[in-house]
């Protein structure tokens, strides 16, 4: 066998390997997570949280049929709370009718009923008229926590949930937890994990945005991450003296249907206080 042929076979084998790897990485799977928060002011509680972000949904019935199946799968695990952390639509230039697409996305979120849900916007949502998103959420009676907080009844207990606007699209505005949340379990949701490192932010935070790099290699890590968050805080669980942050890898992808070293997933979190 001559050298050019050997080289060609090698290239084909490598290409097939990466195609199969990419195909598997794009298949959305459940990622089990356990997080424990030490807060002596809060009576002990254990809740099951489903975290979902970076859907990047395109238009079309097939896309929403597939999303409905994902919602059915998530509900089958009986979570007590759904957290949706932004980037619900694909690249703005690919969307033909954003008004209808926006309605379809928000109506799809209603399939999570009767499970309590908390929602914030991501940069893709803000780039497709964040004000219109906020208005449509209100019109369709779905609560949106953009720089505000809400007390929710979760698993028979009151939970204080705070939402921050996306830092990457300059919508972040710091708000403190209200006084009535003092003795309640508290958590924050936002899109860009940098929001967890803004002045005054402490405690438990959930975020998305990074896709865990989408393309990430051993040793060198992600090639590029659109966030100012510390590099060690762009994927999965991060803890320091002020905060506990969990960043989901997300469901979808940006630019190309490509994931190397990262997986499409949603997270099922056993959360204890």
Spell out what each predicted region is.
Residues 13-99:
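N-terminal active-site segment of His-dependent metallophosphoesterases
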């Amino acid at each position: 066998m001559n050298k050019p042929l050997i080289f060609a076979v090698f290239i084909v084998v490598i290409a097939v390997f990466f195609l199969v790897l990419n195909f598997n990485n794009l298949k959305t799977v459940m990622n089990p997570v356990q997080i424990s928060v030490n807060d002596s002011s809060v009576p002990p509680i254990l809740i099951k949280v489903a975290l979902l972000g970076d859907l990047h949904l395109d238009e079309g019935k097939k896309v929403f049929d597939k999303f409905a199946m994902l919602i059915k799968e998530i509900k089958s695990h009986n979570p007590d709370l759904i957290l949706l952390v932004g980037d619900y639509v694909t690249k703005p230039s690919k969307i033909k009718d954003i008004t209808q697409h926006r309605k379809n996305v928000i109506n799809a979120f209603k399939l999570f009923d009767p499970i309590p849900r908390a929602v914030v916007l991501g940069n893709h949502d803000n780039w497709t008229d964040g004000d219109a998103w906020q208005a449509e959420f209100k019109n369709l009676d779905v609560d949106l926590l953009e720089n505000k907080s809400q007390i929710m009844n979760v698993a028979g207990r009151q939970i204080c949930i705070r939402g921050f606007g996306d830092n990457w699209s300059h919508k972040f505005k710091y708000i403190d937890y209200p006084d009535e949340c003092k003795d309640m379990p508290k958590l924050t949701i936002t899109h860009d994990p940098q929001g967890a490192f803004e002045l005054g932010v402490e405690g438990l935070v959930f975020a998305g945005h990074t896709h865990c790099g989408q393309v990430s290699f051993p040793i060198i890590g992600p090639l590029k991450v659109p966030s100012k968050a510390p590099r060690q805080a762009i994927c999965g669980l991060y803890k320091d003296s002020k905060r506990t942050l969990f960043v989901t890898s997300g469901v979808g992808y940006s630019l190309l249907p490509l994931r190397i070293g990262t997986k499409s997933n949603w997270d099922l979190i056993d959360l204890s206080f």
